[in-house]
A protein has these predicted regions:
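Eukaryotic RNA-binding helical-repeat scaffolds
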Residues: 1-562
Length: 562
């Protein structure tokens, strides 16, 4: 940019002239020097009371675009004088003023904010898409919560022109709503999906990423057709994604439990691998954690690049980054390289005091599943955590209980209170899914036909794993037969490899078998393809294909029946 000297600033008390000078500098991309700026703010402050709405807006907007910070005294005078004329502002002045304040990081006073929402609400019907988008976006940057009445009017008026929104307006509006924690009305969301879908092909990487991330934060499930269009259109732009866009998009899909298509996944791994060297610690952690939550194993080449590149940033990881990364590797059944593990333990030890119960227990559980040797510093924290925070957190306590044998092998003997199992059983989630319920009806009938004297127990709490089994038969084997119905989350790569259950499912099976239980796992897709959902209630007949399948699965275990 060019520079302007003080001699080019005339000594004037003409408000219009001063505004025009600063606005002209902005249009010409000329940055005034510090001396010129100081003289400008002094002269401008004396004339603020004479500005009209557009001049107020243009002055602050030009300062923001030129990245010139007004002095505190000028800011105070600006808010005081502009507040008296807010009722005369038009839609562009409202939008640009708040947007400029956000860009400059200047917080308007409470009274000004209240007047802004009250006066701008009356003009919302005149707002264009950019005004709507920029105003809400500015509110998020300033962490200002619009009034409830303004929000209602915003949704009502913006809905009428959603068809005119461009990709950035769609993305920024939803992203801002998510940042503010404002849930759009159902009708608005319906129109949003309808109108934004045809324009997805025009979205840039940031618009794709921010839109999906916003839906995840708001817990809004996009329609199936919109999702399909999103994957199709975003796949072609993946090579333009930056690290945060890669990370946020996959993380949002995981939070929404939306499985990206296979081709999109392949393109994602290929393109993101090139960008791994530019990932920050949050990008590394969130990407691997999202892959684990979706049950998607990254390709070997990507994994190798991940370990190499992430190792250099481990010193910047926070407790959640450490915990989520190791937890994801365990779930994905990926064994980190020896050197990476050494650096991981060395760097994580420095932050152990900042681990919350969940981060601590997740890290411990992952280490157990991966059969990693714990460093001495981590070992010394185990008993302390059990005595303090973890005793109050049943999820973490359950993890500690299930890793007791692993810890004992490393020289750590945990002593649990007498009421530990009772506490864990009381807090166990015993909700039964539709699939489990229908499978239970079928198992009971098939078992009755095969061995009438053997009974099936539903929701049996197993002390050895401090968890509830879906079904249990006492008479099979040393301790009995545990039958688990495994949904999609138990499998990697969308369940396409039957032997490829996730790390935690495999660990639970080994744990039960070590303790003397027989274990039968029934995959969801094999039940579904054998018509399990045709069973309407407990009196309905078992579909022949399902009956044959269950008999085949039960037979080896029933030979052990006593």
């Amino acid at each position: 940019m060019m520079e302007v000297t003080q001699e080019q600033l005339p000594n004037t008390n003409n408000a219009k002239t001063l505004t025009a000078l600063l606005y002209g500098c902005m249009k010409l991309s000329i940055t005034p020097n510090a001396t010129w700026q100081k003289a400008f703010w002094i002269q401008s402050q004396a004339t603020l009371s004479k500005l009209n709405p557009q001049e107020f807006s243009n002055t602050l907007y030009a300062a923001a675009e030129l990245r010139i910070q007004p002095p505190q005294e000028w800011q105070q005078a600006f808010w005081t004088q502009s507040q008296t004329k807010l009722e005369q502002f038009n839609q562009q002045s409202f939008s640009n003023t708040l947007y400029a304040a956000a860009k400059l990081g200047i917080q308007p006073p409470k009274e000004w904010q209240q007047a802004f929402w009250a006066q701008s609400q009356r003009k919302l019907e005149q707002f264009n898409p950019q005004n709507f988008s920029n105003t809400l976006y500015a509110a998020t940057k300033l962490r200002i919560q619009p009034s409830k009445e303004w929000q209602q009017a915003f949704w009502a008026q913006s809905q009428t022109i959603l068809r005119k929104f461009d990709p950035q307006s769609f993305s920024n509006t939803l992203h801002a709503a998510a940042k503010l924690g404002i849930q759009p009305p159902k009708n608005w969301k319906r129109v949003f999906w309808t109108q934004s879908q045809p324009k997805l092909r025009q979205f840039n990487p940031q618009s794709f990423s921010n839109t999906l991330y916003a839906t995840a934060k708001l817990r809004i499930q996009p329609p199936k057709k919109w999702q399909q269009a999103f994957w199709t259109q975003s796949q072609g732009k993946l090579r333009q994604f930056n690290p945060q866009e890669f990370s946020n998009t996959l993380y949002a899909a995981a939070e929404l439990e939306i499985q990206p298509p296979k081709k999109w996944q392949q393109a994602f791994w290929t393109q993101s691998q090139w960008a791994l060297q530019n990932f920050n610690e949050q990008d590394y952690s969130n990407t691997l954690y999202a892959a684990a939550k979706l049950g998607i194993q990254p390709p070997k080449e990507w994994q190798q690049a991940f370990w190499t590149q992430s190792q250099t940033t481990l010193s910047r990881f926070n407790p959640q980054n450490f915990s989520n990364t190791l937890y994801a590797t365990a779930k994905l059944r990926i064994q980190p390289p020896q050197e990476w593990k050494q650096v991981f333990w060395a760097q994580s030890q420095a932050t152990l005091s900042k681990f919350n119960p969940q981060s601590f227990s997740n890290t411990l559980y992952a280490a157990c599943v991966l059969d990693l040797k714990l460093p001495e510093a981590f070992k010394s924290c185990v008993s302390l955590n059990l005595e303090n925070d973890i005793e109050q957190d049943t999820t973490s306590l359950r993890v500690m209980y299930n890793t007791r044998d692993y810890l004992k092998a490393q020289g750590i003997n945990l002593e649990f209170k007498q009421d530990t199992l009772a506490k864990l059983q009381k807090n166990e989630d015993t909700k039964i899914s539709c699939l489990e319920s229908k499978t239970g009806f079928a198992l009971s009938k098939v078992l009755q036909d095969m061995c009438p004297h053997i009974s099936l127990t539903e929701q049996r709490f197993i002390d050895g794993i401090a968890s509830t089994a879906d079904f249990f038969i006492d008479a099979c084997g040393e301790k009995g037969l545990v039958i688990q119905v495994d949904g999609p989350t138990h499998f990697l790569n969308q369940g396409t490899e039957r032997q490829c259950v996730n790390g935690f499912t495999a660990f639970q099976t080994r744990q039960l078998q070590t303790q003397g239980y027989q274990v039968l796992r029934l995959p969801y897709d094999l039940l579904e393809t054998r018509d399990v959902y045709d069973i309407r209630d407990e009196n309905a007949p078992v579909p022949p294909k399902l009956a044959d399948y269950l008999k085949e699965q039960l037979t080896p275990y029933l030979t052990l029946a006593t």
